[in-house]
């Protein structure tokens, strides 16, 4: 079975538990922390896939490494470890965050700009573009792109809204050529 499908099933189960226990915010925060910890420590995943290490030792490592996370997240991690599917944790995190965002009417977005955007500018972008994608609000990550002359390029899911000066110049160039 496809890893993405498997991750989505585990994410859905964890999401249902989060809703039932009214811990959606806490579990989302924990799952983001787990995802970040695994991204920063790639050796940890390699260690857990080592066949020479017993399952009990692997469980002890996971309990110790993620002692601060909520019980549902820790139980999910241990279950994945038992079923030799710990490698899907990053994908599970992505799927869980998508489910949580969907439930709240939030979309993830990335804003590329020539300089860091202020909170007011990010809020203005969120207000305008959230309506365009049918969401209540956007959670925007701002990335400074020195190649942009000015303006903003916004990516929401697989759509890109290009309001950058360089993007406008490219469109003008295409119009002049054709």
From Swiss-Prot:
Subcellular localization(s) per the UniProt record: Cell membrane
GO MF, one example: proton-transporting ATP synthase activity, rotational mechanism
Chief localization: membrane
Keyword Cell division recorded: no
Organism domain of life: Bacteria
Alphabetical UniProt keywords: ATP synthesis, Cell membrane, CF(1), Hydrogen ion transport, Ion transport, Membrane, Transport
GO cellular component term, pick one: plasma membrane
Topology in membrane: Peripheral membrane protein
Coiled coil stretches, renumbered: none
InterPro entries tied to this protein: ATP_synth_OSCP/delta_N_sf (IPR026015), ATPase_OSCP/d_CS (IPR020781), ATPase_OSCP/dsu (IPR000711)
UniProt keyword Cytoplasm present: no
Record-stated family: Belongs to the ATPase delta chain family.
PANTHER family: ATP SYNTHASE DELTA CHAIN
Known function: F(1)F(0) ATP synthase produces ATP from ADP in the presence of a proton or sodium gradient. F-type ATPases consist of two structural domains, F(1) containing the extramembraneous catalytic core and F(0) containing the membrane proton channel, linked together by a central stalk and a peripheral stalk. During catalysis, ATP synthesis in the catalytic domain of F(1) is coupled via a rotary mechanism of the central stalk subunits to proton translocation.
Subunit structure: F-type ATPases have 2 components, F(1) - the catalytic core - and F(0) - the membrane proton channel. F(1) has five subunits: alpha(3), beta(3), gamma(1), delta(1), epsilon(1). F(0) has three main subunits: a(1), b(2) and c(10-14). The alpha and beta chains form an alternating ring which encloses part of the gamma chain. F(1) is attached to F(0) by a central stalk formed by the gamma and epsilon chains, while a peripheral stalk is formed by the delta and b chains.
UniProt protein name: ATP synthase subunit delta
Organism listed in the record: Geobacillus thermodenitrificans (strain NG80-2)
């Amino acid at each position: 079975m496809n890893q993405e499908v498997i991750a989505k099933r585990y994410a859905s189960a964890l999401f249902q538990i989060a809703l039932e226990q009214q811990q959606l915010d806490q579990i989302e925060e924990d799952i983001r922390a787990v995802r970040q910890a695994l991204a920063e420590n790639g050796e940890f995943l390699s260690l857990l896939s080592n066949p020479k290490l017993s399952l009990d030792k692997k469980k002890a490592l996971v309990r110790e490494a993620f002692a601060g996370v909520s019980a549902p997240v820790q139980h999910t991690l241990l279950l994945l470890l038992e079923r030799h599917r710990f490698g899907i944790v990053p994908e599970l995190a992505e799927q869980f965050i998508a489910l949580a965002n969907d439930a709240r009417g939030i979309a993830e977005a990335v804003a590329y700009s020539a300089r860091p955007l202020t909170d007011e500018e990010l809020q203005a972008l969120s207000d305008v573009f959230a309506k365009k994608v049918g969401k209540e609000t956007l959670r925007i990550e701002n990335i400074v792109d020195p190649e942009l002359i000015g303006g903003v390029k916004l990516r929401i899911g697989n759509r890109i809204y290009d309001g950058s000066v360089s993007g406008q110049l490219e469109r003008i160039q295409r119009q002049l050529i054709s």
